[in-house]
Amino acid sequence: EIEALGQEITWENIGDPVRKGEVPPKWIREIVADLVDQADSWAYCDSQGVAEVREFLANEVNRRDGVRVSADDIIFFNGLGDAVAKVYGFLNREARILGPSPAYSTHSSAEAAHSGYGHVTYDLDPYNGWMPDVADIRKKIQYNDSIAGILLLTPDNPTGAVYPREIVEKIAAIAHEYDVFLIADEIYANIVYTGAGRLHMSEWIGGVPGIAMRGISKEFPWPGARCGWLEILNKDKDSNFAHYVDSLLAAKRLEVSSTTLPQMSIPRIMGDPRYPEHLDARSKQFSRRADEMSGVFAGCEHIIANKPEGAFYYTIIFEDGLLDDSRSLSIENPKIREAVERMTEGVEPDKRFVYYLMGATGIVVVPLSGFQCAHHGFRATLLETDDKKRAWIQKSLRDAIDEYVASSR
């Protein structure tokens, strides 16, 4: 509606690097083009995934220190959205998964839909770099015996936080103590630009049963491929967990197969000697953009703007209690101003800011209240490839924050 009224829109709400202008390297596109000419890339594959690809991915896991897997521990899906729906949908009805807050909506909505209740969460602490509150995790599990598993996203969406080994090992120890399994959404595992480096679930989970969620959408990047997989860890450690995993595979077999061509590309692309260089170059690129973002918001009063260390996003929160319905941004176009005033009636305080931001600047970000979070703020991305436009986006956000905070004084 705002766009129809004449405001040019800048989309900062979706993590699609290709849509934001990133072009996958030519050598990756050439591999995919070559595979299109192979007849078997047009056929169904095994329901669990192409056998050779699963063998390749199992070997990749086994190159690390930690849990060993086989090709039978890899299950392909049509993107992680498909995998997430199955992972939550085939739990026992009364079983709950404890997830982080801010909560990525794909997980939180699927878990809530499965259980019929609101998603149960533990806190990520914005005053400590968005690290998980381990004491809160323990408390939530200790007093809720319906919790069957703990979810982590690392690197995290929406905060960009990357959890150090000491934190995830503490969470694994709690899972072991209370006999629950772990889920790690690792779709951004190779997009890390902190000095700590990349850390994979198989390296820190120990003997706890777990599921690592992986895919190619963010790191090739090829979001349109809809190709993701689960790495099943320590299936043999718990019979209930083994039965649950078998139910996931049985459900997958009813769908015949997942997309064949993207699977077939994985060994050729990930096994190419240019791939590590590709990952490192992208990490350095996002590191530079994170530095830019951190510099723009440094010294900005009334907010917390933690510098991201992985993934594509950063999250900014306002001081608790700061936002209210007396604040606004100046909007020159009267029709847009009228539309925004109508849209903001009775909405969450951060959603009000987001609507005014869209009306005033055309920039679309995601309110943090949409991530089942008690803090008010928003998520934006580091994906804009045009340096001047990215600088404009970040400066516009900073200016909008300053104006909005001052508007009711």
Regions found by a protein language model. Give the residues of each.
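Conserved PLP-anchoring active-site segment centered on the Schiff-base-forming lysine
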Residues: 90-111, 139
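N-terminal small-domain helix-loop-helix segment of the aminotransferase-like
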Residues: 1-79, 86, 133-136, 269-272, ...
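Conserved glycine-rich beta-strand-loop-beta hairpin in the small C-terminal domain of fold type I
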Residues: 267, 283-294, 304-321, 327-341, ...
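PLP-dependent enzyme catalytic core of the Aspartate aminotransferase-like
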Residues: 59, 63, 67-68, 328-409
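Active-site phosphate-binding strand-loop segment of PLP-dependent enzymes
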Residues: 124-198
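Generic structural signal for small/hydrophobic residues in well-ordered secondary structure
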Residues: 12, 57, 74, 97, ...
